[in-house]
């Protein structure tokens, strides 16, 4: 009898409790394993001093000595090796002739777009920090990386955070300290966001990390010629704000040079590989925004991962806060979702990268920022 009463009470109480429905709707049906990459590594074997060009005629590498090279290029690129008739290059970083590998190619910028609302999914306009990225890797005559230059073309800020930082990191397993010194082309004050030792126009990697973190900026806003507005180059109703391009030179320790074949870019950490990551910092040092599978630094605020129920800088339905195009493309206007501005972005993501890397065509110009031009392909 008591058992029947308890069962009856349980039924009555249960009928009074309303379990909230999960109202979350995934905007895109993205395969869980999709890495959001438009780039890949292609292995090239050089047997004599050579240049490398892609199918468009863009220069990927110049004056490479014999060796194996893992070149980061747009997916499905066709690469050609052309014998060089020039003399071997000088070894000084900044010299006019260099043995160099370029990303995405010589004299051209890829486009990096960050969303600042991590760990929330955000408004998906991907314009909170936008910049052109070009990296030059300098090698010695044994095909080892000895230095690299990170070229930045600031383009837009759609973030309300007054302080935004950019940084790179270089790491491998087991941990190794690679960097000898860093120098900046401008008088940027980097240690308002990053803890560095600075002297004589050079500065150190950020102190207190398990691997080398290379500050690229102090406040990213300092490179925009407009100190009064928060939103810069993200609304067509606003006047164009010009920006200052700059670069950061990174020289490696003589005993830490590594074979170019070991280099990866924006890839997960892996034994035997040396990866270079690019990430953003929004508001405070702990709020880092990385590409999917990026490695957080010691200053990252790890409770953010509790909010996302993931630890790889992607949501449970595999949305991300960092996107890269290998081309110089226009970014969405404020509050315009990237997959509305670029209709093929949706099919590209939902197919797990199918159809190649050209999701930026066609474009809906009404949804894109068009009040200025940073040598866009569209």
Provide a role label for each language-model segment.
Residues 13-34:
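Bacterial Sec-dependent N-terminal signal peptides
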Residues 64-98:
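Short Pro-Gly-centered beta-turn/loop motif in secreted/extracellular proteins
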Residues 133, 145-156:
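Short, well-ordered beta-strand segments enriched in hydrophobic/aromatic residues
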């Amino acid at each position: 009898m008591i058992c029947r009463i308890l069962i009856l009470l349980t039924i009555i109480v249960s009928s009074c409790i309303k379990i909230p429905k999960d109202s979350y709707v995934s905007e895109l049906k993205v395969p869980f394993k999709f890495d959001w990459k438009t780039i890949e590594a292609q292995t090239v074997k050089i047997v004599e001093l050579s240049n490398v060009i892609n199918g468009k005629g863009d220069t990927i590498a110049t004056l490479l000595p014999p060796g194996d090279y893992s070149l980061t290029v747009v997916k499905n690129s066709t690469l050609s090796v052309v014998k060089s008739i020039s003399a071997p290059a000088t070894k000084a970083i900044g010299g006019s002739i260099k043995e160099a590998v370029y990303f995405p190619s010589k004299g051209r910028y890829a486009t990096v777009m960050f969303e600042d609302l991590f760990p929330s999914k955000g408004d998906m306009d991907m314009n909170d920090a936008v910049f052109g990225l070009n990296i030059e890797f300098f090698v010695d005559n044994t095909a080892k990386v000895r230095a690299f230059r990170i070229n930045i073309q600031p383009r837009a800020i759609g973030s309300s955070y007054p302080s935004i930082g950019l940084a790179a990191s270089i790491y491998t397993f087991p941990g190794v300290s690679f960097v000898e010194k860093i120098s900046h082309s401008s008088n940027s004050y980097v240690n308002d966001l990053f803890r560095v030792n600075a002297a004589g126009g050079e500065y150190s990697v950020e102190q207190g990390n398990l691997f080398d973190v290379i500050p690229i900026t102090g406040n990213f806003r300092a490179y925009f010629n407009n100190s009064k507005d928060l939103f810069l180059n993200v609304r067509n109703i606003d006047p164009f704000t010009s920006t200052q391009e700059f670069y950061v030179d990174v020289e490696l320790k003589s005993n830490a040079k590594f074979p170019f074949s070991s280099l990866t870019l924006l890839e997960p950490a892996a034994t035997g590989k040396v990866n270079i990551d690019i990430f953003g910092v929004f508001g405070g040092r702990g709020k880092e925004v990385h590409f999917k599978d990026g490695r957080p630094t010691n200053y990252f605020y790890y409770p953010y991962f509790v909010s996302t129920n993931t630890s790889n800088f992607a949501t449970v339905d595999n949305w991300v806060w960092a996107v890269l195009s290998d081309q110089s493309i226009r970014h969405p206007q404020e509050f315009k979702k990237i997959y509305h501005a670029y209709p093929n972005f949706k099919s590209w993501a939902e197919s797990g990268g199918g159809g190649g890397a050209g999701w930026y065509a066609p474009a809906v110009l009404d949804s894109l920022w068009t009040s200025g031009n940073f040598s866009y392909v569209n």
